[in-house]
Amino acid sequence: MTFEACTDYLGFFKILPKDWQESIVPVWKNFKASTSGYLLIDNNQIIAGGLVFSKCPPDMLYAENESKAWFNKGFLYLGFIYVIEEKRHQNLGSVWLDNLKKRIPNQKFWLTIEDLKLDAFYVKNGFKYVKSFYNDGIEEAVYTFEG
């Protein structure tokens, strides 16, 4: 298994859930220059990946001021972190995050989650809960990693 910078974004997007694809693919050209992607590859198959944004990502446009505040503090946004279904529960999300932290040492990251059951996963990986806000009545929790 290898951790690689993404060169095949469309290949990565194909492993994402349909609703995630619908939120990134149509606007990708607007974010490509300010976003890096990283993948876990096993036997020439993308098994996990995620995007690192240096400007407000498409799924956070409703909270653009919040995004700007984090970017102004030197944080990068992690989004679209995904492990394919058949490889779940093998610690690959943690492997992806560990490799990212090694690839970009001393970098601060922030992210949001809607699935609050992911709290334990992110805390286990060194992230700290900061606050919550609501988007269309749905709670989103903000987490940071301070490198």
Where on the chain are the PLM-derived regions?
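Short amphipathic alpha-helix that is part of the acyltransferase structural core
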Residues: 1-49
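A generic local structural motif
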Residues: 23-26, 63-66, 96-99
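Conserved acyl-donor/pantetheine-binding loop and adjacent beta-alpha core of acyl/acetyltransferases
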Residues: 32-80, 88, 136-140
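Extended, folded domain segments that form the structural surfaces/walls around functional sites
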Residues: 80-81, 111
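Conserved acetyl-CoA-binding loop-helix of GNAT-fold acetyltransferases
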Residues: 83, 89-102, 124
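Conserved GNAT acetyl-CoA-binding A-motif
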Residues: 102-115
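Conserved active-site alpha-helix within GNAT-family acetyltransferase domains
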Residues: 115-139
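Short beta-strand-to-coil "C-cap" segments at the C-terminal boundary of structured domains/repeats
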Residues: 144-147
